[in-house]
Amino acid sequence: MRPDFHKQELIPVIVQDYQTNQVLMLAYTNEVAFEKMLETGETWFWSRSRQKLWHKGEESGHFQKIKGMRLDCDQDTLLVFVEQIGNACHTGTYSCFYDELIPFDDSDIFSELEKQIIDRKLHPVEKSYTNYLLGEGIDKVLKKVGEEASEVIIASKNSDKGELLGEIDDLLYHLFVLMNQQGISLEEVRQKAKERHQLEGNKKEFHTRTAD
């Protein structure tokens, strides 16, 4: 399956962050630029203002490493998932879509939590609970994970949704601290989840015991 460049010479390309799905920019590509993307694994476009091929990041160093690509139902629009190096927008912002017309919170809370824990590790803050846990070492972190898991179980038995949500939140936080302590990133967890869900035949079968 390929874009239909016979229908129109230039087709729009929507570029998204492959981790957060944040829309970074909209550009246009022609058949030559499209082939360049397939060959190099980086984004190439056609600059309508300069009337020439445009290798994203060639001048700024803000390259886009292609992680995935999809074609729409009419074969005339591309959706490209990338690892963004630096900022996508020439204004210096990460995304070109920063002028908010109608407020919408598209933040990835788990990515933000991971970043916050990493920042605490690199730049310790006095009386920070995160720094306290990281400083105490693996045994303390594991103890807290166990305690919070038990609290989730108790809250579940109490049939109190509000309490359960709070305990799940506490457990997730401590799991993120453990991940940081063990050098595991959120992206690695996401990739492992994808591998497991995409694995063919990965289905649990329930068997009943029959009398002999």
Swiss-Prot record:
It catalyses: 1-(5-phospho-beta-D-ribosyl)-ATP + H2O = 1-(5-phospho-beta-D-ribosyl)-5'-AMP + diphosphate + H(+); 1-(5-phospho-beta-D-ribosyl)-5'-AMP + H2O = 1-(5-phospho-beta-D-ribosyl)-5-[(5-phospho-beta-D-ribosylamino)methylideneamino]imidazole-4-carboxamide. GO terms for molecular function: ATP binding; phosphoribosyl-AMP cyclohydrolase activity; phosphoribosyl-ATP diphosphatase activity. Pathway: Amino-acid biosynthesis; L-histidine biosynthesis; L-histidine from 5-phospho-alpha-D-ribose 1-diphosphate: step 2/9; Amino-acid biosynthesis; L-histidine biosynthesis; L-histidine from 5-phospho-alpha-D-ribose 1-diphosphate: step 3/9. It is an enzyme of class 3 (hydrolase). Its EC number is 3.5.4.19, 3.6.1.31. NCBIfam families: histidine_hisI (TIGR03188), PRK00051.1 (NF000768), PRK02759.1 (NF002747). This is Histidine biosynthesis bifunctional protein HisIE. The gene is hisI.
